Amino acid sequence: MADSLDHAPAQANNLPQFLALTIGAIGVVYGDIGTSPLYAFREALRPFGPGGVGRDEVIGLVSLVLWTLTAIVTIKYVLFLLRADNDGEGGTLSLLALLLKKGTKYPVLMFFAGVLGAALFIGDAMITPALSVLSAVEGLKLVAPALHDYVLPISVVIILLLFAVQSRGTGAVSVFFGPITLVWFLMMAAAGVAHIGDDLAILSAFNPLNAIGFLWNAGLIGFIVLGAIFLTVTGAEALYADLGHFGRHSIQAAWFAVVFPALALNYLGQGALVLSHPDAISNPFFLMFPNWALLPMVILATAATIIASQSVITGAFSLIRQAIHLGFLPRFEICYTSETQTGQIYLPLVNTILLTGVLALMLMFGSSEALAPAYGVSITGAMVIDTILAFEFVRRQWGWPALTAIAVLLPLFNLELVFLGANLLKVHHGGYVPILIAGTLITMMWTWRKGVSVLREKTARQDIPLSQFMAIVERKSEHAPVQVPGTAIFLTATPDTTPAVLLHNIKHNHVLHQHNVIMTIKTARVPYVPEKDRYTITKLSDRFSLLELRFGFMDDQNVSRALARCRKEGFKFEIMSTSFYLGRRKLIADPQSGLPQWQDKLFIAMADSAIDPTEYFHLPANRVVELGEQVII
């Protein structure tokens, strides 16, 4: 596996590389938003009912779609937020890490905002596969109405296969994601162009006054419809989250050259079709195609939704890894499915949780029409969070005056709040799902941070300063521990105090190695740490040294590889005569700990689910010694 420097944020050095990144971005970054035409316009028409939508309403709806895409995606994400990066990386937690690193007047507020945004994204990662795959497979009902009862079983099988292959990695097939999705966008554009001529009046949708007029005249229905209109921009947050994988210029080029034109043309075509054939309101996307093309389009749509689902699953894996490295969650097992790309990862526990959630949603709601109301809440919430974090970013990082930041971001913030309000109206129709998912994840992150803090406070009462300990053991006395040859490395989170495992080793084994290394692992609030800054070695005495290893929150925390680098640069030790000492704590709940009993139990359960540090840090298992202790928390 290559070093982290090989996985710095993507940059194109020549035209072929730029085109490759741009096509790749079309598949990964825009897969989600590219499947929205399957259901978004249909859902916007649904409140009017068959025959209840007039010409002005159709034109107004399409105008709303076009200007929502312009305001939210083009202006906020493509032109603005893509510039707000953390050493080339984007995403909610990446932006939060940068704000915490630079300093903010509201660290607690920013922390909870960032955690909420991340939690809402996980809700999106469950809803997107369920909704998009169902909406694609439902096209079979137009091909053969007799297949109606098979839509859900077929969708479930596709989801099962999708999650089953995650452990094998997607590197071999991911090269096809971009070309397949490019074909999908071209077909959508062609279908739109073919139907715009059905009623050229649809072109007046480019006039924003039609969108404003629709909202003014539609009243409550117009407000309700905004929740469905927002479905057209679901997936926009992926632009920001995938910034490090493809680079700003490639993502922008893909949007302006392919994605935005294709989406605009398709929505215009759907609108023109409904103007000329009002009965097409039932499924305007698939009814754009002649009967002979329906089956190929269902197959292509299914492929596109699988790619979109894969993108959010990969995004969820990446986000949880960031949360682990930033200390928001315990260390879950992380498997690397590529020898060359550290971004291709697989988290077995997260995969199982996502699969369970997706299947539960599909079986609970049964159709894309029933599930669609659940979708908008998580996306609008995540986008509002991005705007809040962006406001603090431009103030702290770019030095914008408060009035300038307000003038730029307040209109977008107000627009997103309106969309959020419209989506909250659908809470009882399924909008509660992402709220429950986000609430669960926030509770877990908060419990973990609070539990770790309480645990550190309890252990700190028994800590012995490292300098004091060294002075004691280096005194010559009959009670001094026996010196044995070799090197011992003691892993600790607090390098100024004596590791508990070192104290237990002397207490039970009465020995001290010839060379003792106190090793601490720090996660920097940057995505990647250069190899030249990976470690610092400080000699404390003839027998003790302090080794600090530093990793970014996107780095693979491979301690064995880092130690090999140290050895090349003069840190003298032999791996086969080195023992790694790790402490294993057995946590016992204490009603007087300061945590509620339910939170005590949740924290202990999360700690028990964490992967063994030996495996997580890639330590040589045959050189690891674990000593346990009970801690009442």
From Swiss-Prot:
Protein name as catalogued: Probable potassium transport system protein Kup 2
Membrane protein topology class: Multi-pass membrane protein
UniProt GO molecular function: potassium ion transmembrane transporter activity; symporter activity
Transmembrane segments: 18-38, 61-81, 107-127, 143-163, 173-193, 211-231, 255-275, 287-307, 345-365, 371-391, 402-422, 427-447
Similarity remark: Belongs to the HAK/KUP transporter (TC 2.A.72) family.
Major subcellular site: membrane
Compartmental location: Cell inner membrane
Keywords of the record: Cell inner membrane, Cell membrane, Ion transport, Membrane, Plasmid, Potassium, Potassium transport, Symport, Transmembrane, Transmembrane helix, Transport
Gene Ontology cellular-component terms listed: plasma membrane
Catalytic activity reported: K(+)(in) + H(+)(in) = K(+)(out) + H(+)(out)
Functional note: Transport of potassium into the cell. Likely operates as a K(+):H(+) symporter.
Entry-linked PANTHER family: LOW AFFINITY POTASSIUM TRANSPORT SYSTEM PROTEIN KUP, OSMOTIC STRESS POTASSIUM TRANSPORTER
Positions of disulphide bridges: none
InterPro entries: K+_transporter, K_trans_C, K_trans_N, Kup
One Pfam family here: K_trans_C
Originating species: Rhizobium meliloti (strain 1021) (Ensifer meliloti)
